[in-house]
Amino acid sequence: MAKAIKKVVLAYSGGLDTSVILKWIAVTYGCEVVTLTADLGQEEDLDGVDAKALRTGASRAYVEDLREEFARDFIFPMMRSGAVYEGRYLLGTSIARPLIAKRLVDIARAEGAQAVAHGATGKGNDQVRFELAVNALAPDLDVIAPWRIWDLRSRTDLTAFAEQHGIPLSTSSKQYSMDRNMLHCSFEGGELEDPWCEPGPNSHVMAVPVEQAPDTPEYITIEFKKGDAVAVNGEAMSPASIIRTLNTIGGRHGIGRLDMVENRFVGIKSRGVYETPGGTVLHIAHRDLEGICMDRESMHLRDQLIPRYSEAVYNGFWFAPEREAMQAFIDKTQETVNGTVRLKLYKGNAYPVGRTSPNTLYCHDLATFEDCATYDHADAAGFIKLQGLRVRGYAQRVKKD
């Protein structure tokens, strides 16, 4: 780093890693450290985390409730796109990083800091997500990533450093490396590093094991306006409240469990177990509503963008021009995605069983198997003949041998 670092803003959880990082940055750079702890609905008690940061050496500690902004400006736009990474993962961790990075930059500007810092390791995707976001929002800021530069290599090293510098240690131990926010909870490490090993019971936090789900189905309705959920069971709610409500409902039915080996952006295959109960229900309902009120060609074109959009989110390009351009097109397609979906929740599944929309493109007279005057079956012959010109010509010229 060419310029002098006098103040750093650190993404701080209050755990061992970021507490050690806080002290390490202060000692190594001889600079002031400001912390940001973001409440993204992770259901953790954040009382006292600011006091711990100050005791560990921070000059100022921000603890911010970002739940509504997270749901409104990050989760919901992503949900409108139908994003799903590698056909399975609903991007619960990925979508949280841009908001944290944005707030790091905002605070760095307000505090006159020269750098921001994070606690992501050198093997994971999060380091990329944080730093690409900072690059996009504040290219002049330096980024400090201690895990890539310090000589602390293990939990034992971290613990020794903490004891040496009087950093309070938690006595609890975790079976897995967990990351949670209002959209999902992820589990990695431990026994999960063996891809053949079934996840243990401690990997159930947001959703019950499907064997323990009720034996009776539950019916719910979700109302959408312009692709965003606005009400559950007829009750209007804020974006964050909708996610929380669907987490509770979907979680008790064991919905949203995923166990997969995915391709990290850094080139490593990684096994993760994810719980996304509310997001899964929302994803299924949204997709179903599109079927009745979204133009076919618009839908198919949008569907071609889903893998690319999902990769942009997963790889950390939320603030990149291509993601913003795709979002503009997606949002245009969502202008008519208005209506209500009825779902049946049962034993780990969410089944759409009804849908209605003021913008419906479904025409009963055209779709019915009964005789009607609207559709002339004879018209199909000319349509098929014209559609067959290309393949008939190919067969006559290329396949004649």
UniProtKB/Swiss-Prot annotation:
<dbReference type="Pfam" id="PF20979">
    <property type="entry name" value="Arginosuc_syn_C"/>
</dbReference>
<feature type="binding site">
    <location>
        <position position="129"/>
    </location>
    <ligand>
        <name>L-citrulline</name>
    </ligand>
</feature>
<dbReference type="InterPro" id="IPR048267">
    <property type="entry name" value="Arginosuc_syn_N"/>
</dbReference>
<dbReference type="InterPro" id="IPR001518">
    <property type="entry name" value="Arginosuc_synth"/>
</dbReference>
<keyword id="KW-0436">Ligase</keyword>
<dbReference type="GO" id="GO:0000050">
    <property type="term" value="P:urea cycle"/>
</dbReference>
<dbReference type="InterPro" id="IPR024074">
    <property type="entry name" value="AS_cat/multimer_dom_body"/>
</dbReference>
<feature type="binding site">
    <location>
        <position position="38"/>
    </location>
    <ligand>
        <name>ATP</name>
    </ligand>
</feature>
<keyword id="KW-0963">Cytoplasm</keyword>
<feature type="binding site">
    <location>
        <position position="186"/>
    </location>
    <ligand>
        <name>L-citrulline</name>
    </ligand>
</feature>
<feature type="binding site">
    <location>
        <position position="274"/>
    </location>
    <ligand>
        <name>L-citrulline</name>
    </ligand>
</feature>
<comment type="subunit">
    <text>Homotetramer.</text>
</comment>
<feature type="binding site">
    <location>
        <position position="121"/>
    </location>
    <ligand>
        <name>L-aspartate</name>
    </ligand>
</feature>
<feature type="binding site">
    <location>
        <position position="119"/>
    </location>
    <ligand>
        <name>ATP</name>
    </ligand>
</feature>
<dbReference type="GO" id="GO:0000053">
    <property type="term" value="P:argininosuccinate metabolic process"/>
</dbReference>
<feature type="binding site">
    <location>
        <position position="94"/>
    </location>
    <ligand>
        <name>L-citrulline</name>
    </ligand>
</feature>
<dbReference type="Pfam" id="PF00764">
    <property type="entry name" value="Arginosuc_synth"/>
</dbReference>
<feature type="binding site">
    <location>
        <position position="262"/>
    </location>
    <ligand>
        <name>L-citrulline</name>
    </ligand>
</feature>
<dbReference type="InterPro" id="IPR023434">
    <property type="entry name" value="Arginosuc_synth_type_1_subfam"/>
</dbReference>
<dbReference type="GO" id="GO:0005524">
    <property type="term" value="F:ATP binding"/>
</dbReference>
<protein>
    <recommendedName>
        <fullName>Argininosuccinate synthase</fullName>
        <ecNumber>6.3.4.5</ecNumber>
    </recommendedName>
</protein>
<comment type="pathway">
    <text>Amino-acid biosynthesis; L-arginine biosynthesis; L-arginine from L-ornithine and carbamoyl phosphate: step 2/3.</text>
</comment>
<dbReference type="GO" id="GO:0004055">
    <property type="term" value="F:argininosuccinate synthase activity"/>
</dbReference>
<keyword id="KW-0547">Nucleotide-binding</keyword>
<feature type="binding site">
    <location>
        <position position="89"/>
    </location>
    <ligand>
        <name>L-citrulline</name>
    </ligand>
</feature>
<dbReference type="InterPro" id="IPR018223">
    <property type="entry name" value="Arginosuc_synth_CS"/>
</dbReference>
<feature type="binding site">
    <location>
        <begin position="11"/>
        <end position="19"/>
    </location>
    <ligand>
        <name>ATP</name>
    </ligand>
</feature>
<feature type="binding site">
    <location>
        <position position="125"/>
    </location>
    <ligand>
        <name>L-aspartate</name>
    </ligand>
</feature>
<dbReference type="InterPro" id="IPR048268">
    <property type="entry name" value="Arginosuc_syn_C"/>
</dbReference>
<comment type="similarity">
    <text>Belongs to the argininosuccinate synthase family. Type 1 subfamily.</text>
</comment>
<dbReference type="GO" id="GO:0005737">
    <property type="term" value="C:cytoplasm"/>
</dbReference>
<feature type="binding site">
    <location>
        <position position="177"/>
    </location>
    <ligand>
        <name>L-citrulline</name>
    </ligand>
</feature>
<keyword id="KW-0028">Amino-acid biosynthesis</keyword>
<feature type="binding site">
    <location>
        <position position="126"/>
    </location>
    <ligand>
        <name>L-aspartate</name>
    </ligand>
</feature>
<dbReference type="GO" id="GO:0006526">
    <property type="term" value="P:L-arginine biosynthetic process"/>
</dbReference>
<keyword id="KW-0055">Arginine biosynthesis</keyword>
<dbReference type="InterPro" id="IPR014729">
    <property type="entry name" value="Rossmann-like_a/b/a_fold"/>
</dbReference>
<keyword id="KW-0067">ATP-binding</keyword>
<feature type="binding site">
    <location>
        <position position="125"/>
    </location>
    <ligand>
        <name>L-citrulline</name>
    </ligand>
</feature>
